Amino acid sequence: MKTLIAVSVLSILSFGAHAERQSNEPIKVIEPISGLDSKKIELGKTLWFEPRLSASNTISCNSCHNIAKGGVDNLPSSIGHKWSIGPINSPTVFNSDLNFVQFWNGRAKDLQEQAAGPIENPLEMAFTHQLAVDTLQSIPQYREWFQQAYGSDNITIDNVTDAIATFEQTLRTPNSPFDLWLKGNDDALTTAQVEGYQLFKDKGCTACHSGPLAGGQMYQKMGLVKPFATDNPDVG
């Protein structure tokens, strides 16, 4: 009985220490998503890979945000309709639901609003929302899937973008070595990695790079509009 009590006390103390580590660290654990509608997820996944949402019938969401390539296309800037080269680099889709806004300039408040943009962008999919909806409406299987997911086979652009956004929310990357270390697994990181993280904090990097994404939660001057000038001798 004493042994059982001792083990229980040790387990409680260990859990408390692990929970304290998570709460005290500026970078947080990426947790898997839960509670989403499975039918919307599967429909959104299909739409994610659907090239018929583009004018050329060749470009899908996955063309620029390839989930087999880290959620990007590994290009300086993406190639769109008629081989047009866009002006910006594609951000990764992984963990994107944790961003405080969408697009590099934050012009979309959430993933659903973001999903509507590329369809009508002349440099990307070069379609219209109405043509995209009409295309899906003409396909019996899609009408059936939308009926199952949304209770109606009358397809709307809002339902299209909602389904895509729902699928995107599943594209998280939990249980990285660092996440496991934050959860209390001391063997998940090497001694050098832990020392590097401590240096990262000591130098003040976490003032900007914090939260589950280790950053991406504020706007910064990047010199894209005009050269960034400062009198601060610290250029790091």
Task: Cite the ranges covered by each PLM segment.
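Short alpha-helix boundary/capping motifs
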Residues: 72, 121, 139, 174-175, ...
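Short glycine/threonine-rich turn/loop motifs
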Residues: 20-117, 179-236
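Bacterial N-terminal signal peptides
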Residues: 6-12
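N-terminal signal peptide c-region/cleavage motif recognized by signal peptidases
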Residues: 14-16
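Amphipathic alpha-helical substructures
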Residues: 144-200
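Positively charged n-region of N-terminal signal peptides that target proteins for export
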Residues: 1-4
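Periplasmic c-type cytochrome electron-transfer domains
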Residues: 81-169
